[in-house]
Amino acid sequence: MSIDDKVRAIVKEFKAYVPGKSKEEIARNYGIDPEKIIKLGSNENPWGCSPKIAEKLMDEVSKLHQYPQPINPELMDEISKFTKMPVENIIVGGDGADEVIDNIMRILIDEGDEVIIPIPTFTQYAISAKIHGANIKWAKFDEENEFKLDIESVLNNITEKTKAIFLCTPNNPTGNVIPTEDIKKIVESTDALVMIDHAYIEYSNEDYDLTDWALKYDNVLVLRTFSKVFGLAGQRVGYGVTSKKIVDYMMRIKPIFSLTRASQASAITALQDKEFFEKCLNEGIESREEIYNGLKKFKQLEVYPTEANYMLVKVKNGMNSSEFCEVLLKKGVIVRDCYSFEGLEPYYFRVSIGTFDENERFLKIMSEVVE
């Protein structure tokens, strides 16, 4: 019997996750100087993380032989102050928000349970739900209506078998937010757990922030992350805000030491450096508007409104998204080809914010590629 005969059938159905391309990969493949490559494909903070983090990391070097604290009181206190949520309603994960997603599936899903996912959206939801035995019921963000959530496609899929519903807002990759009244209607129409993914909420109008709903409703879990505006994608720190009962159940099965000493120190310092946070947020929104307005001038592109640090763009010059993105790669520009997102036609790509210098160079290159 080979290993293929022993691997679970559901695993064989999966395709490997397609991440955004790195500067190093493009430099190798196309012979381009890495310093000249413009990386706008992974929804990162182009200004990086707080400069104060480097010093804090050096303080941890002498302690790397010691296990980290499973629960770091200082980190929990800083997250509590930032979100204005009680510490006992917070759970922190060491693989970004992905760990929180996976742990909630582990405590909720039995074989045959149902999970509702509107698409196109973040692909990790379906991977985690399926691997734990869930049947996926697909809802939709309506392409014909600027990718607004088709709320009826969610409500009509709710059954007694529904254990969880994922709502990404702002949605990745479309960038739009789900109206608060629609989320309220969904939450109040079911006792299934509604996971509101707020990975990009800092870039949105504060009225769209529903983190406090974790205290108002027993069936809400809000996902947050340090990977975006805080510039810590490489440290993999995310967290959830939810009811005390759900936190308790998740702590029973959560990996004990998933947050490293380095990731804890980085997250604490990022939260404390409020000046750098505000700078990155304000300049990030300005960068977003600069790219959006610049791309809107090209007749061969359709650019969708966004409340995140990226925007979805449709190619209308006869190329599909992979062909178009290949042209950009050869010119040293990395954007995200969205062909791998379930529910999208092969004509879309996603552009993240850049520094203002990167934006200027990117838009100049775009003028050479499209009309």
UniProtKB/Swiss-Prot annotation:
Superkingdom of this entry's organism? Archaea
The UniProt GO MF terms for this protein read: histidinol-phosphate transaminase activity; pyridoxal phosphate binding
The catalytic activity of this protein is classed by the Enzyme Commission as 2.6.1.9
PTM sites of type N6-(pyridoxal phosphate)lysine: 228
Query: What start and end residues bound the annotated signal peptide?
Result: none
An example GO biological process term is: L-histidine biosynthetic process
Enzyme class (EC, first level) = transferase
Please give the pathway this protein is involved in: Amino-acid biosynthesis; L-histidine biosynthesis; L-histidine from 5-phospho-alpha-D-ribose 1-diphosphate: step 7/9
| Catalytic activity, reaction form | L-histidinol phosphate + 2-oxoglutarate = 3-(imidazol-4-yl)-2-oxopropyl phosphate + L-glutamate
The record's Gene3D superfamilies line, in alphabetical order, gives: Aspartate Aminotransferase, domain 1 (3.90.1150.10), Type I PLP-dependent aspartate aminotransferase-like (Major domain) (3.40.640.10)
Could you tell me the keywords of this UniProt record?
A: Amino-acid biosynthesis, Aminotransferase, Histidine biosynthesis, Pyridoxal phosphate, Transferase
Cofactor annotation: pyridoxal 5'-phosphate
What the record says about family reads: Belongs to the class-II pyridoxal-phosphate-dependent aminotransferase family. Histidinol-phosphate aminotransferase subfamily.
Q: Which HAMAP family match?
A: HisC_aminotrans_2
According to UniProt, the name of this protein is Histidinol-phosphate aminotransferase
Q: What is the lineage of its organism?
A: Archaea, Methanobacteriati, Methanobacteriota, Methanomada group, Methanococci
Q: Which gene encodes it?
A: hisC
